[in-house]
Amino acid sequence: MAEKEKTYVQDVDRSLYDFRNEEKDAYRVKSGLTSDIVEKISEEKNDPEWMRIFRHKALETYNKMEIPDWGPSIDELDMDNIVTYVRPNTHMSAKWSEVPEDIKDTFEKLGIPQAERKSLAGVGAQYDSELVYHNVREEVAAQGVIYSDLEGAMRGEYGEQYAEMIRTHFMKLVTPGDHKFAALHGAVWSGGSFVYVPKGVSVEIPLQSYFRLNAPGAGQFEHTLIIVDEGASLHFIEGCSAPKYNVANLHAGCVELFVGKNAKLRYSTIENWSKNMYNLNTKRAQIAEGGVMEWVSGSFGSHVSYLYPMTVLKGDNS
């Protein structure tokens, strides 16, 4: 029998992603992880009291847990050298023209505004620890679809019913006790998107959030929470990248997806990380009776990747 020809996979061309901007952040916490740092992040985020308490309890859990030993070694990752919150020198806007030129240039090089115009129902763009742009098409919003920054929704800025949804669902699928970096996420999370698709609504074109980590030696801890109600459907796309530095960067995002009865959700991810990145990501979906969940994931680069996806088939025929 003839020997099968071997196929070799070369490194992905990262020239599109390795450009970097001069650091112009408005505020950053000190490196490391302490109760004071967690409190400062909570103040910066204007958290409701329940979230402030949640963060500190997550920090307590983090301090009690060991580094996971079920994957590649991450012994070289030193949290004392990681900056867990970096606020860019801007605010979130629904108008692309209001985004600062240097940040706008970053996302334009990545093709985000072009993609929004051509084929997306809405876009969120996060730069370091904060969303800088978030917008959804009027016809999608008219269907009752909520696509917003998670923090604003948590504070009730889009309606108290959505604030209550977040309090009911936040880190209930991925709990701080799952593993050490889930606890870390619970303590210092910042940014991310909230999506609610009402009963029976079909979002015909995708929503997308893109996360760009620019600051060297920093971490990014966005949280994505999606609720697709009974009989509804959605395709959500997530993109992530960062330039290459000579110091470690950390990405420990979290995704929680709730798919209702006879609902359908497709979650697509493309991550292209530099070789100095520790990518420690946890994603989980819970599917009700007759619901359908589709994961499409492509993760490239990084120094170490822990990707921890899970689907909980809670209902019959899911």
Located regions from the model:
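A generic structural signal for ordered alpha-helices
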Residues: 15-20, 29-40, 60, 173, ...
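A composition-driven signal for long, intrinsically disordered, charge-rich low-complexity tracts
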Residues: 1, 62-65, 300, 311-313
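Non-catalytic terminal regions with compositionally biased, polar/charged low complexity
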Residues: 19-22, 45
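N-terminal amphipathic, basic helical "cap/leader" segment at the start of enzyme domains
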Residues: 4-8, 27-178, 182-183
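Conserved beta-strand/loop scaffold segments within soluble protein domains that form the structured core
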Residues: 133-135, 139, 143-147, 151-318
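Intrinsically disordered, low-structural-confidence terminal and linker regions
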Residues: 1-15
